[in-house]
């Protein structure tokens, strides 16, 4: 069975756009760089050629990865999400029970996570602790920096 990869519509569009760019813009640019480096002669000591081949390998690997992710994507329509229990797509406002610092996170797919933008991966320790909880619940998160306790202040959708 192929594991589905949950993601938002925005995350899906970003993957499609990166795939398009890598196939239609980056791939031809790299092929041109390889041809140009080949024209310089001896390939065994041609740093430009080896760098271009390495870039090609990296690009083709990422294309394969993107094609796989897109094929397995399970796009979650956040506009249809509701309820008081936290699940994928929820925007959750928390307060650190020790420091009283408030934080807001949206639970998104692994490929969309960006803590600086307030988007955390569904597979992160904090998201795993939040799933199924409601406003007023407290959670304890065992993260690499140690154990932290949070209270859930709000759950929003969309």
Curated annotation (Swiss-Prot):
Taxonomy, superkingdom: Bacteria
Name under which the protein is recorded: Transcription elongation factor GreA
Keyword DNA-binding: yes
ATP-binding listed as a keyword: no
InterPro entries: GreA/GreB_C_sf (IPR036953), TF_GreA/GreB_CS (IPR018151), Tscrpt_elong_fac_GreA (IPR006359), Tscrpt_elong_fac_GreA/B (IPR028624), Tscrpt_elong_fac_GreA/B_C (IPR001437), Tscrpt_elong_fac_GreA/B_fam (IPR023459), Tscrpt_elong_fac_GreA/B_N (IPR022691), Tscrpt_elong_fac_GreA/B_N_sf (IPR036805)
Biological process annotations from GO: DNA-templated transcription elongation; regulation of DNA-templated transcription elongation
Family named by the database record: Belongs to the GreA/GreB family.
Gene Ontology MF, one: DNA binding
Record gene name: greA
Summary of the function given for this chain in its UniProt record: Necessary for efficient RNA polymerase transcription elongation past template-encoded arresting sites. The arresting sites in DNA have the property of trapping a certain fraction of elongating RNA polymerases that pass through, resulting in locked ternary complexes. Cleavage of the nascent transcript by cleavage factors such as GreA or GreB allows the resumption of elongation from the new 3'terminus. GreA releases sequences of 2 to 3 nucleotides.
Keywords, comma-separated and alphabetical: DNA-binding, Transcription, Transcription regulation
Alphabetized Pfam families for the sequence: GreA_GreB (PF01272), GreA_GreB_N (PF03449)
Organism: Rhizobium meliloti (strain 1021) (Ensifer meliloti)
């Amino acid at each position: 069975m192929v594991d589905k990869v949950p993601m938002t519509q925005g995350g899906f569009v970003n993957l499609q756009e990166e795939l398009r760019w890598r196939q239609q813009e980056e791939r031809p640019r790299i092929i041109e760089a390889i041809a140009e480096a080949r024209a310089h002669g001896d390939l065994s000591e041609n740093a430009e050629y080896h760098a271009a081949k390495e870039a090609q390998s990296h690009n083709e690997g990422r294309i394969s990865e993107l094609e796989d992710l897109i094929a397995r994507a399970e796009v979650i329509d956040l506009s249809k999400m509701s309820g008081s229990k936290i699940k994928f797509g929820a925007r959750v406002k928390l307060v650190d029970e020790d420091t009283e610092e408030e934080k807001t996170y949206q639970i998104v797919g692994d490929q969309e996570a960006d803590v600086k933008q307030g988007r955390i991966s569904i597979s992160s320790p904090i998201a795993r602790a939040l799933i199924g909880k409601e406003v007023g619940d407290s959670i304890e998160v065992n993260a690499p920096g140690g154990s932290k306790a949070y209270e859930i202040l709000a759950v929003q959708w969309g």
